[in-house]
Amino acid sequence: MVGNAYTLFEGNSADDLYKAIVKKRTTYEGKPTPLYQAILWSYKVVYTSEKKLIKSLIFRIGDNTIDSIKLYKKILGVFGGFIYILTPLPIVSGFLGNYYLKKKAKEKMKEV
């Protein structure tokens, strides 16, 4: 699973980072992202999208990408977002996906 990772190096500027990479003097730190954080993040993304889509149904919001979407596609997007937010679908799919990935990882480790 994607994690909360970051690069450690001496210095604090982009030039210092570049020099550390060239000299191969970087290290990494971090940990895996917990499943609940990934699910909450996805809820936040959908919620923010829902707000923009609903607002764009009533007003022109000044975002050419959203304003150019046809009305029926906006309504379909709002409906899909409601299904995502109001059902346990993200939680169930998160746990099933996590189970599947762990199972596949164990199978790959046995091959090594």
Curated annotation (Swiss-Prot):
CC annotations in GO: membrane
Keywords: Membrane, Transmembrane, Transmembrane helix
Top-level taxon of origin: Archaea
Chief place where the protein resides: membrane
Location in or out of the cell: Membrane
Membrane topology type: Single-pass membrane protein
Residue ranges crossing the lipid bilayer per the database entry: 75-95
Protein name stated in the entry: Uncharacterized protein MJ1588
Organism: Methanocaldococcus jannaschii (strain ATCC 43067 / DSM 2661 / JAL-1 / JCM 10045 / NBRC 100440)
